[in-house]
């Protein structure tokens, strides 16, 4: 499989480290997964720049350093079952699939889900389950989850997602208004309740209810 040239990949990994992505498993997964497969059209030549890029349905593929920092904050273990809310391009799910036992990823846009499925098949990632659904309600039939990651901003951590997090589990998500800078937070579920840590400022598209009208 053709990917970036060695110099581009080296610069990519250096940029990740310089932004604080230091976990060896996360870096190895991001080195292995070709971001270029998830960026199409006019922006395909910019896949290895540390910047968000537009994709279909008015969505974006997050900048790699943010993907790395969110994945690192999630502290994924090899036996974990992970829920991703907001498949988008599929890039984040592909990285999670290198780290976890099973990944469930949902998106409200069927078009994005179909496109991501094709790339997952190309990469032979057989431990990802994709579906078109309103991710703000999670996946009750598959709960509880060891880890949950949300790639769109909500004003607060959605109650259904908190309920589907295992005791001892971690959720990472951006919270805040969609038209301002948001805060990336990490939620840990304990026997007593939930502990919240603020990690860094971010900008994400809003988490919307319902299904997209893209068919």
Curated annotation (Swiss-Prot):
Where found? Cytoplasm
Q: Does the keyword Ligase apply?
A: no
Which reactions are catalysed by this chain? [protein]-L-isoaspartate + S-adenosyl-L-methionine = [protein]-L-isoaspartate alpha-methyl ester + S-adenosyl-L-homocysteine
Any one GO MF term held by the record is: protein-L-isoaspartate (D-aspartate) O-methyltransferase activity
This molecule's function is given as: Catalyzes the methyl esterification of L-isoaspartyl residues in peptides and proteins that result from spontaneous decomposition of normal L-aspartyl and L-asparaginyl residues. It plays a role in the repair and/or degradation of damaged proteins.
- Please name the catalytic residues of this protein: 62
Q: What is its EC number?
A: 2.1.1.77
Q: Please give the chief subcellular localization of this protein.
A: cytoplasm
* PROSITE patterns named among the record's database cross-references: PCMT
Family note: Belongs to the methyltransferase superfamily. L-isoaspartyl/D-aspartyl protein methyltransferase family.
State the source organism's domain of life. Bacteria
Q: Which UniProt keywords apply?
A: Cytoplasm, Methyltransferase, S-adenosyl-L-methionine, Transferase
Q: Does the keyword Nucleus apply?
A: no
One GO CC term on file: cytoplasm
GO BP, one annotated term: methylation
State the protein's name.
Answer: Protein-L-isoaspartate O-methyltransferase
């Amino acid at each position: 499989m053709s990917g970036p040239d060695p110099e581009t990949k080296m610069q990519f990994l250096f940029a990740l480290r310089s932004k604080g992505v230091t976990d060896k498993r996360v870096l190895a997964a991001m080195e292995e997964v070709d971001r270029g497969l998830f960026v199409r059209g006019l922006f395909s030549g910019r896949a290895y720049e540390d910047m968000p890029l537009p994709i279909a349905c008015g969505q974006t593929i997050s900048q790699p350093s943010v993907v790395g920092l969110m994945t690192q904050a999630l502290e994924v273990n090899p036996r974990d079952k992970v829920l991703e809310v907001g498949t988008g391009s599929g890039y984040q799910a592909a990285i999670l699939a290198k780290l976890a036992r099973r990944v469930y990823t949902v998106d409200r846009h069927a078009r994005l889900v179909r496109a991501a499925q094709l790339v997952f098949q190309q990469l032979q990632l057989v431990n990802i389950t994709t579906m078109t659904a309103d991710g703000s309600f999670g996946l009750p039939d598959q709960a509880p989850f060891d880890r949950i990651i949300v790639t769109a901003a909500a004003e607060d951590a959605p109650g259904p997602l908190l309920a589907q997090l295992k005791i001892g589990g971690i959720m990472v998500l951006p919270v805040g208004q969609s038209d301002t800078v948001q805060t990336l937070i990490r939620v840990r579920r304990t026997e007593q309740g939930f502990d919240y840590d603020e990690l860094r400022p971010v900008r994400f598209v809003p988490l919307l209810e319902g299904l997209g009208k893209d068919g």
